Amino acid sequence: MTEVKLDFQKQGGLIPAIILDHTSKEVIMLAYLNEEAYQLTRTSGQMWYWSRSRQELWHKGATSGHYQTVKKITADCDQDTLLIEVDQLGAACHTGSKSCFFHIIWDEEDSKTD
């Protein structure tokens, strides 16, 4: 395991985190962590985020029961973005969807002509 120095200052004290379902490898969320949320995530084994809209720490699942248990945390080459694999209990999205990414804007079928 490699110890990295995450760069929280590059983006105003926050690091974006791409959240993957550990089993399916599907992207289920994009959220942000500040240093405190990162430390809470590391020590608790559950996901903690920084809510940009509410300006407060957010323990994923504390209200909904849809907890995320951390399986793996990887930093990108610049050490300013995280890729986090989780076991998702219930829906990841506040809409009740498994993933927050369900609005298909374009796919290869859109570019095919008859």
Curated annotation (Swiss-Prot):
Catalytic EC class: hydrolase
Q: What EC number(s) does this enzyme carry? A: 3.5.4.19
Binding of Zn(2+), residues: 77, 93, 100
Task: Say yes or no: keyword Kinase present.
Answer: no
Q: In which pathway does it act?
A: Amino-acid biosynthesis; L-histidine biosynthesis; L-histidine from 5-phospho-alpha-D-ribose 1-diphosphate: step 3/9
Compartments annotated for it: namely:
Cytoplasm
Subunit architecture: Homodimer.
Function of the molecule:
Catalyzes the hydrolysis of the adenine ring of phosphoribosyl-AMP.
Q: What is this protein called?
A: Phosphoribosyl-AMP cyclohydrolase
Q: Organism classification, top ranks?
A: Bacteria, Bacillati, Bacillota, Bacilli, Lactobacillales
